[in-house]
């Protein structure tokens, strides 16, 4: 019991330190006068619409987790699914290339009784649905507005095309794992043999066999889980619909900012598709939250649309898409740490360890 108290004390200290660091980070990054001025200049109804878009983004991502876990036979209630979503968003926002979210999501689901293998398969399925929605909107947006992009600055277009290509390749890899696992294993084997053929590896006597075996195990496990999880076609349709709704909601924030500053004349779908393309281009930058590329890309893509409100609208957009997610996600991190169910499970383990065991000698 004393050990648990010490652990709780350190957890509380860590949470307080993290809260202070997060507050300092936000204070350093944002100009408070600009923030106040920006929101004071906006129409309240569009501020509410902007917040509503982000809430829809969170809720429909959570619904997607709920449907996917149902299809795998390990259903999560909505609140657990929302916690999984927000933990992923928070840790992705604070790590390079958004790489930190998935491990914490797998850990969270594992705590709820879902095996690590199944949790990984759930994450991959959710990831695939998001990529389908994102790539579909990206291809459509690029087909319609490639001329607008060229007019906004030719230097930006190669990054956007590369970002779209990488998203397509990522989607293709996940799809191959699900539909044609042997193809992906064959391609992966060729790539790994090529990588391990580099002098850096050969000089150390490293062989690709271990990496190839790990790839085979992962792909085969995911394919098995996919076959099981894809039996319920209705849940697949629901999950895919949720992915499109959350993607469109997230990509509508720039339009809410546009209308909030009293601007009109640009159709909704144009502003929305340009935000999709901005997301694809900025995703190449490995900084947390694609910092720098997101702001710079916004200023470049929208400079012909937002006029004198460009800087303020960018600030509002960034506050919603990044800092709001950071704040809400952190609240879920704290709530998850303080969840009474965690304490109950810890007490159960403690009581189980204190139960008297029979003494074989006495018997």
Task: Report the location of each language-model feature.
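Hydrophobic faces of transmembrane alpha-helices in multi-pass small-molecule transporters and flippases
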Residues: 47-51, 86-94, 124, 236-244
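Transmembrane helical segments that form the transport core of multi-pass membrane transport proteins
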Residues: 225-277
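Alpha-helical transmembrane segments of multi-pass membrane proteins
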Residues: 79-88, 269-280, 309-319
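A short amphipathic helical element positioned immediately N-terminal to and/or at the very start
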Residues: 33-41, 109, 218-230
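Membrane-interface helix starts
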Residues: 8-10, 41-50, 227-241
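Transmembrane helix-loop-helix hairpins in multi-pass inner-membrane proteins
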Residues: 1-37, 88-203, 287, 291-363
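Short, membrane-interfacial amphipathic segments enriched in basic
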Residues: 197-222
């Amino acid at each position: 019991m004393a050990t648990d108290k010490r652990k709780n004390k350190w957890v509380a200290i860590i949470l307080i330190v993290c809260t202070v660091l997060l507050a300092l980070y936000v204070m350093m990054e944002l100009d408070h006068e600009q923030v106040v001025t920006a929101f004071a200049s906006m129409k309240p109804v569009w501020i509410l619409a902007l917040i509503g878009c982000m809430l829809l983004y969170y809720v429909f991502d959570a619904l997607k987790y709920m449907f996917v876990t149902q299809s795998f036979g390990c259903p999560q209630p909505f609140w657990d699914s929302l916690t999984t979503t927000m933990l992923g968003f928070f840790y992705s926002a604070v790590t390079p290339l958004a790489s930190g979210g998935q491990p914490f999501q797998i850990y969270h689901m594992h705590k709820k009784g879902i095996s690590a293998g199944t949790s990984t398969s759930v994450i991959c399925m959710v990831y695939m649905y998001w990529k389908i929605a994102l790539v579909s909107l990206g291809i459509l947006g690029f087909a319609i507005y490639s001329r607008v992009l060229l007019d906004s600055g030719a230097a930006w277009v190669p990054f956007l095309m590369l970002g779209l290509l990488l998203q397509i390749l990522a989607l293709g890899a996940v799809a191959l794992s699900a539909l044609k696992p042997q193809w992906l294993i064959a391609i992966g084997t060729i790539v790994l043999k090529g990588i391990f053929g580099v002098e850096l590896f050969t000089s150390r006597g490293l062989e690709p066999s271990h990496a190839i075996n790990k790839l085979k195990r992962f792909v085969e496990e995911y394919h098995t889980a996919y076959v099981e999880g894809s039996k319920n076609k209705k849940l697949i349709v629901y999950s895919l619909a949720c992915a499109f709704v959350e993607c469109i909601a997230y990509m509508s924030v720039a339009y809410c900012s546009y209308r909030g500053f009293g601007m009109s004349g640009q159709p909704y779908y144009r502003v929305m598709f340009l935000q999709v393309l901005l997301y694809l281009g900025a995703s190449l930058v490995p900084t947390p939250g694609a910092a720098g590329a997101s702001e710079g890309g916004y200023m470049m893509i929208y400079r012909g649309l937002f006029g004198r409100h460009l800087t303020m609208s960018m600030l509002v957009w960034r506050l919603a898409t990044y800092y709001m997610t950071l704040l809400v996600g952190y609240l879920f991190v704290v709530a998850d740490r303080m969840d009474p169910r965690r304490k109950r499970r810890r007490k159960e383990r403690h009581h189980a360890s204190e139960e008297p065991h029979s003494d074989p000698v006495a018997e």
